[in-house]
Amino acid sequence: MPAGRAARTCALLALCLLGAGAQDFGPTRFICTSVPVDADMCAASVAAGGAEELRSSVLQLRETVLQQKETILSQKETIRELTAKLGRCESQSTLDPGAGEARAGGGRKQPGSGKNTMGDLSRTPAAETLSQLGQTLQSLKTRLENLEQYSRLNSSSQTNSLKDLLQSKIDELERQVLSRVNTLEEGKGGPRNDTEERVKIETALTSLHQRISELEKGQKDNRPGDKFQLTFPLRTNYMYAKVKKSLPEMYAFTVCMWLKSSATPGVGTPFSYAVPGQANELVLIEWGNNPMEILINDKVAKLPFVINDGKWHHICVTWTTRDGVWEAYQDGTQGGSGENLAPYHPIKPQGVLVLGQEQDTLGGGFDATQAFVGELAHFNIWDRKLTPGEVYNLATCSTKALSGNVIAWAESHIEIYGGATKWTFEACRQIN
């Protein structure tokens, strides 16, 4: 470029810069830039000044595009999963000849397929109602048997007369249910009759529940604080008991209890202890066709217990963090032992202790297929390993039997939920 033209270019650029800003920023300095002959000098200067801003905007746009792309990919993956699940459902409906009935009344849920709220479901609404009524009647009969036993011990003529009245009511209800079963089998009865009979039976059951609850309340007022049992009559995800106290940090423990169950397959979960970050900190469970197991920090040991014969059994498990050594006792006799069960892992404090349910989350996440069905009493925990003699004293109801120094069986320490019940129980006097 000739020297004269370059000088004119610098002069024009200086005029553009001076015209673009009215403020005085101190001594003026001139910057010469080579540009094409036909270019607009002022426009070129402004473009050079905004280059950084444009570059920043481009980077922000690129980041936004990448984020949107990730969101779209995630949504596509979700759509693919939902489509696959829908396809499986449709294929099962096509292959299953009873799909229509299953949709109308529910179907049997396979273990491990997800949360189950009520265990086994019946084929039709009517059959389901009758099944639930039968279970309720059985629960009421069991409660009356306990009241009868209590009245014998206390020689209460008023309790006996009321018990006889309630027993006759239950017998009448059983006849109504049996009659309804026969009607269903013969294919008789319409929706209106179904509704009327169900309302009548449910009304009678409600009245019975109230009367029995009054009896049990009077029974509770007169019994010692540790002479009681918990009953879980149904396999649900809402029936449980919670111990008000938590556990301290423990480097050894012994847990003992009385259990009675005839549930199959598996009696369920007598107790579970969960802490933040670990739902299986300490669990006793018998699920499906597996043997009973003890879990510590999600580590498992199989126990030699056989208790689902409908009889009362006393069980104890001892453990120490040193080498993870454990021992299992049934009815006062050691039946198994092992080591390397969560060695050198202390039981963590400040958790939630639940009776009758397995926790998938802290204090919840219950699954009906893992619920305990049966009766439980004298649940005690010590922060040490009991000796075989001490365990034997517990199983034989010796006067030397100890109460738990961490968790002691007391009615004031237990809260019940969802229909679980408490009534009088005296170990060794009422067993089998």
Swiss-Prot record:
Disulfide feature: C256-C316
UniProt key word Isomerase: no
Keywords: Calcium, Cytoplasmic vesicle, Disease variant, Disulfide bond, Endoplasmic reticulum, Glycoprotein, Metal-binding, Neurodegeneration, Secreted, Signal, Spinocerebellar ataxia
SUPFAM superfamilies: Concanavalin A-like lectins/glucanases
Signal peptide (UniProt feature, chain positions): 1-22
GO molecular function: metal ion binding
GO cellular component, one term: endoplasmic reticulum
Protein name: Neuronal pentraxin-1
Gene expressing this chain: NPTX1
